[in-house]
Amino acid sequence: YTPIRSKQMEIQAHTSDDFSILNFKDGTDNQFKVEIAIGTETDIMFTGWLSVSDLRQRFQPHPNVLVLTATDGLGFLKDIDLTDISGDQFTDENKIIEYIAAALNKTGLELPIEVEMNIMESTAPLAPSGNMYNFCYLHALTFETSIGEFDDCYTVLEKILGENSYLTQEKNRWYIKRVDEYDNHDPVSVTFAYDGSTVETSYFELYKKEIGSNSLL
């Protein structure tokens, strides 16, 4: 089971005397931010970072094909120890969503967090505040490996998700879904801001479309 499902986008562009792999040779993997939009520039479907190490281009005269790969940054989390949004160590008890938001913030992407996970504690209200990640707390010691040292952010997310839910990026937001709700045709989700604060409850948009023989796309 894979609870963290990273995504990447591959872009191909023609090179010229002014544009080639040399434009990126001095960059790092979190220097060039990539946004993929459909229709209009504001209709962003994917946000990530250009993976400089994955650039590909044949060393032949222009024009040539330059292949650029953008990743969502989730792989970066394997090398970053858990701290809160401000960069300080967690102490005492904190909401589960605060750990999730702090870990995802280390990707460098301030994206909203969509949670479709409708298991609730028996006394929780039927409101965004009652979402399990917002209502339930975990002690910071849950993720402490030794005194003053914590799991990396990737491991923290794996522990929280377990085999119950998965995390990916969908339509320019982090998306957490409970596996047993995958076939739910009337799903309810809670949107959190990138820092873990509650935004709203909404009925999640279904990813399906009916296409007739005379329909135009």
Segments and roles (model prediction):
Residues 1-92:
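Beta-strand-rich assembly/attachment modules of structural machines
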Residues 56-215:
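Charged- and aromatic-enriched interaction segments used to assemble
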